[in-house]
Each structure stands twice: as C-alpha cells, then as structure tokens.
C-alpha cells in the first residue's frame, strides 16, 4: 500500500488566443474564398486618343505605374478573412468592417468543439495527477495519526501480527464466526504498483477463496477510491488480474466508516477481518470500525517510494515503543485467543 499516513500523465490545456488564429496566411490561398470587393484594386486610365504624342504617351505610362498599387499585406489578410454573410449564416462572432466603401464581416473561426475535447483530456490528466500525489500525501491519514498519537494509541495495535498471509489459518477464522475478509492491496497482496499477486501467496489466497467463497474483497487507497480512480479503470484492471472484488469507496483509509464495506458483505464489521501492512492506516481503520485486524510485513520495501519507507519506519518505531510500555489492542468479541488462527506454513 502506498499512502503514507503521517505525511504527504500530461499537458495542460490553454485556450488558443484569437489573435493567433488571425495570423497572416502562410499557405496557398483557398480558391473558394470570395474576394472582398467586385471593384478592381486599380483601374486603367481611359485609352488615349490616337493623336497623343510620344511624350504624352510616356507621361501617361509613368502615371499608370504610379497609380498602380499591388495588393499589400492588409489586402491579403482581408481577402483571406472575409466571406459573404449569406454563405454561412450559422457563424457567430462576426465583426463588421469596411473595405472600399462596402460593408463586410470578419469571420472568427470557432474552436469550441476542439476545446471541449481538450478540456476532457485536461480533466483526466488532473485526476491522474491527484491520484499519484494522493498515494503519497494522505491528508486524512495525517489528521487521523495526530488523533491516534494523542488519545487513541490502542487503535494502532493489531489483534495479531504475521509475516504474510501464509501464516493465517482461514478455516479457524471461519469456524469462529467470521463471514468475510478485507485485504489491502500494495505490499499485502501485491508488490507496490503491481497488479499480480505475490507468487508465494497464491496458494493461501486460493485457500481463502475456497473457505470464504465470494466474501473476500480488496479495500485500497490505490484502487477503487472514487476521487482518484475516477473511471474505475484501476479497480477493474486489478479485479481482472487477481479475481477478487475491489470495493469502491469515497474516503481514504484510515478515515471513513465501514458503511460501504458492510453493505457489500451484508454483515456487521465485527464479523469481518481486515488484513494490511500499515499500522496507521489499515489497522487504525479496522480497529476503529470493529474489524478483527491482522498486520502483515511489507512484501517489498525496495519498491516503495522514499517517503513511504521513512513513514513506515516511524510507524513501526511508535508501535514497538507502545507495546514495550504494555499497551494492549482493543478487544474483539469473536476472538479471545489470537494464537488459534496463526499457523506455520507447510511449504516453509
């Protein structure tokens, strides 16, 4: 599991400026565009009489050259931007202009449709970014940890601690009256950021499925959390890989109630088992809501982010200190002797 409890994919979208859209054309002109005026840019002078002298002809020719004006940048720009208002009545954002004495309308291209697609992409990117940060910065965990350290230290202590899932006797737990099992994901079932069950744990997981049937689920801050797994893609991918239901929830552990979990299993939380590797998240959440809590060792510390490793060290240091001082875990109504459901794996 990747959320530290005591501490904290990809381009941004910006609307395209309209001035950028009105830059001068640099590609060949569209032959379908209508010119802005039926008047010629320059009109040739009336033909001279046959009696004109060569000097007059030369003077007239020079005058024509002076009066002749080639299309300037402004002309090209207007020719490119203007169109007849009767050709496309659906356009908006038209700006009336004047050219050679005739009214014309400046057409600004619409970009709203493209913007919608870009905005959706930007929203998905932002959700993914929040998910990545949320797995490292657990605000709910920080607030809960302060409360635990100050007044609820017994919530950090699990009912039982084991090396991994292979040491749990699922048959005994079923006989004791437990109706379902809730697993954390990262470093409990899988390596961090992995979808595959840790290979040595597969026989134990299959045994748990055989004993509890469909009454097992994953309750994780890295998959199924509505705020960060906005389209359920992470939850669905994990379900397809491990064959275990991933619970959708709105609040990160250790905050929140067990209402969503109880609704899924159809029983009270006191009849459920919470298995996880983090004392200040999985165990605090389980004890606070009445689960039987089982703490496992992390499967792979090497693949954890640096901040998670440091927070984990602090959590375990506090846990060991409080145990040395004689602090006891909260009582559970279905179990009096926790050693009954701990076994030594046969394959070790």
From Swiss-Prot:
Molecular function GO terms recorded: phosphatidylglycerophosphatase activity
Pfam families given in the database record: PGP_phosphatase
Question: A single GO CC term, please?
Answer: chloroplast
For this protein, the record's Gene3D superfamilies field holds: HAD superfamily/HAD-like
As recorded in UniProt, its EC number(s) are 3.1.3.27
Note the pH dependence of activity.
Answer: Optimum pH is 8.
According to the record, the residues making up region (Disordered) are 17-67
Q: Where is the composition biased (Polar residues)?
A: 55-67
| Catalytic activity as recorded in UniProt | a 1,2-diacyl-sn-glycero-3-phospho-(1'-sn-glycero-3'-phosphate) + H2O = a 1,2-diacyl-sn-glycero-3-phospho-(1'-sn-glycerol) + phosphate
- What pathway does the annotation place this protein in? Phospholipid metabolism; phosphatidylglycerol biosynthesis; phosphatidylglycerol from CDP-diacylglycerol: step 2/2
Q: Where in the cell is it found?
A: Plastid, Chloroplast; Mitochondrion
Q: Which UniProt keywords apply?
A: Chloroplast, Hydrolase, Lipid biosynthesis, Lipid metabolism, Mitochondrion, Phospholipid biosynthesis, Phospholipid metabolism, Plastid, Transit peptide
In this chain, the site described as Required for phosphatidylglycerophosphate phosphatase activity is at 184
**Catalytic EC class:** hydrolase
Tell me the protein family, please: Belongs to the HAD-like hydrolase superfamily.
The entry's function note states:
Phosphatidylglycerophosphate (PGP) phosphatase involved in the biosynthesis of phosphatidylglycerol (PG), a phosphoglycerolipid predominantly present in chloroplastic thylakoid membranes and which has important photosynthetic function; seems to use PGP 34:3, PGP 34:2 and PGP 34:1 as substrates. Required for thylakoid membranes development and chloroplast function. Necessary for normal cell growth. Required for root growth and columella cells organization.
Q: What is this protein called?
A: Phosphatidylglycerophosphate phosphatase 1, chloroplastic/mitochondrial
